[in-house]
Amino acid sequence: MHKKRNHKRHILIILLTFILIGVAGVFITINREQIIDEWDWLTIKSEQKMDVPIENQLPEYPNGCEVTALSMLLNYYHVDVTKRTLARNIKHVPSFEGGKYMGNPHKGFVGYMTIANAGWCVYNEPLYDVAHKYTNRIRNYTGHSFIQVMKLVSDGHPIMIISTLKFKRVNDMQTWDTHQGKVKVTPSSHACVITGYNKKKLIVYVNNPYGKKNQAVSWKDLEASFNQQGKQALYMK
């Protein structure tokens, strides 16, 4: 009888141990990103500003902010490519497919870059694919938090992100039905290259594809737009 009680006690202890390990695992998973973010905030430099060459998407590409931003990023690292080459070689998809579905910016640029009001946007995957044709140093950093993005900027890496025209959260997000499923899109979608920041002032510097070099924007507003647009980012290793 005594042996049976001990056996049951051992089983109970083992079960409790597994439960505690499981709870701890969930806690660690939930808080891992927060811990990384807090560490990155503590360790980034007080300020940074890089001399990334500025380009203007106009007049050739009224809807070509993404390839223009990507061209700026690649040219900073002396990759011999132009926005025209990128625009020509990135995958394109029609705005409407089969009369029922919208084009998917995760698959290619939706519409026309060269015709005002006839094009939409393109997301990280086609941008990565076209950049990879010219350099194997390109990295897709999509899904990382904004502070992790800024840690790379602190370390001397300009980063291209998908934001919005005014670099702040918008209220005109749409949900498109595409062949691959539902996709969030805004007519205010806009790309830029983060070139630096001032940590104390909570200012981020961006190269705006409308020809504005090191434009100062609100850190919090840019972060909000970055999150709303799916945390899409590319940089060079």
Please report, for each region that a protein language model flagged, where it lies by residue.
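Structured segments of extracytoplasmic/periplasmic soluble domains
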Residues: 68-80, 89-96, 130-137, 151-155, ...
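Extracytoplasmic/secreted proteins, especially bacterial periplasmic and envelope-associated proteins
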Residues: 60, 64, 68-72, 85, ...
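Noncatalytic regulatory segments and standalone regulatory/sensor domains
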Residues: 173-181, 185-186, 193-237
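Envelope-exposed proteins and targeting segments
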Residues: 61, 157, 188-190, 202
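Active-site-adjacent structural segments surrounding the nucleophilic cysteine of cysteine proteases
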Residues: 2-3, 7-125, 165, 172-176, ...
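Predominantly the structural core of cysteine protease catalytic domains
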Residues: 102-188, 197, 235-236
